[in-house]
Amino acid sequence: MTVQAENTAPPRLINRELSWIELNARLLELAEDPSQPLLERVKFTAIVSSNFDEFFMVRVAGLLEQDEAAMGVRSVDGLTPGQALESIRVRVAELTARQSRLWKRDLRPALAAHDIEVVSLKDCSERELKRLEAYFERDIYPILTPLAVGAGQPFPYISGLSLSLCVTAVDPETGEERFARVKVPEGLDRFVSVGKRLVLLESVIGHFLPVLFPGMDVTERAYFRVTRDADFDVSDDADDLLEAVESELRRRRFGDVVRLELSASASQAMRDRLIEGLGVRPTQVYDIEGPLDMADLWQLVSLDRPELKDEPWVPVVPPRWARMKSPTRVFDEIRRGDMIVHLPYDSFRASFEAFAQGAAHDPDVIAMKTTVYRTSDDSMLTASLIECAEEGKQSVCLVELKARFDERRNIEMSRAMEQAGVHVVHGFADLKIHAKMTLVVRREEGGLRRYVHIGTGNYNAATARLYEDVGIFTADEDIAADVADLFNHITGFGRPQRFRKLLVAPFDMRSRILAEIDRVSVAAAAGKHARIRLKLNQIVDPVVIEALYAAGQAGAKIQICARAICMLRPGVPGLSENISVRSIFGRFLEHSRIYAFEAGEETTYLIGSADMMPRNLDRRIEVLVPIENARARQELAAVLDSTFSDTTNAWILAADGTWSRDVASGAKAHPHQLTMMRRAQQRARRGDRGR
């Protein structure tokens, strides 16, 4: 039964899932923006599709489980699972229809105008069809397997996110109608070249279907795609975490179907067959007018057409790093004073990877410990850890096996490092290790000294070129001691009694964040300067949100930049009129977590891995580090000033949960990311000794 979604949510909170969907709406608006380079618009369109895939695999899957279990309990925003699902269905259908229209009416014609022509087979010449027929017979036909349904043949297993054709064929002699499924091969390019033009792979298969069904009349074909539940839980009692995760990965392949995407042209009979065979509700079916799975548009984005893309950005080598004659000099520089790095404006390779290489090459280094949540295949960090192990240094890597959709990569990386002699630790079954921290121990005059890096982003060279993040390199003794204690807690399961400077979840981070908010509230009530500025990915935690409401009511000015989910309602009279919320999108993904609490003349700056969500504060190992170095604090202040001044790629959240783009032109235009790029270049030209 379809549940009508009444808006019974209390005014204090915005629904989490609906807030996330609006992230995709903002991305789609960028894709629609004609001022963006054409292939960047195509890229944003592809990201919308891949984002929705993950959303259905995890969030919608969980809501369906709750709804099927008749769990009518309302979430903190006031919606039941059924109401949330109906609201999601309506909004996702709107956005996917808008995405299809964008492709058909705008992007595809614009690409054709630049000689990237994606055509249907009916527009192909006889010569082009001959070439496609040869390609089909040589490269496609040998790997196709039509699977009939009925007459003793069960409905076939359909793998998650795979693209398929459903086919109805009639025997001309008996009039018997048969139904079959043909999977589109995953190892072939989605866009097939035919001369200077491109056609979709599934349309080539659809055109030559009679070859697969000789002696039958193909009466209907349509394209479909299923999304399966991909979330999993590992038992807290698991003796071998790696083995338990591997077992769950095998099970995940057979998760329940949570979404069926289907060509809008499919007949009702074909639709009914798929609904019955896949065991889904009619409300889980999404009609698609254009191509299914637009995430494959990345193939077009990868074309060598620089004039249709953003001008390439070459990360700057920060001046203090540029002066180093060898990687081993990094420790001398850190001793001179903390160094902050702002990615991707600053170079990841010249900073963090140089730090890791320095640990591997320096004969005075005796130990290196790090955390890995997501990393790249060509990671210099893992190479440095292996080199440390081969040199007889203590080399420890805490690998989070439950990093969603990177589980397989992390398992393989763990085994490779273990075989090379690295001590690999997988942490806890019930707590993800999400902290980004590295500890290097060095033998120096006067004894051992520890060096630390703590950041907001993953140690991943690929994403470091695309994601905006910050990190600090320090030899502060208290911070280093805290990091060492935390590593020992994770590897040895001892419980730290207290932390000197770090805020660590799930131990004291929540209470200390609330204490910082309260400190600002007290200052506001006393008539002193009181401001909170939060730059993060998501703000979901109801307790933190209520504390922010209270601080705003006390008179504090609160500015929030949330990239994705924001359940806080800004601008509500009597509740949150002193709170403003924005979101910034551009060529780089805003990923850093920077927190500033200003009370009177005292300001606390924090950076780290944690968003303001219950999972980050209560169910993960997370770290926030206070920034005390004056130059580093100035840099963070500049980042926040620019963030909250953007008038080019900022969206503003209204009290009703809607977002609107804040666009200015001429002298009033302030593009945050471009400002940061110019700032990095100017700093490098000046040889700024503070960085």
Language-model segments: residues:
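N-terminal localization/anchoring segments of enzymes in phospholipid and broader phosphate metabolism
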Residues: M1-I532, A550-A554, C566-R691
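Polyanion-binding catalytic cores of nucleic-acid enzymes and NTP/SAM-utilizing transferases
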Residues: V544
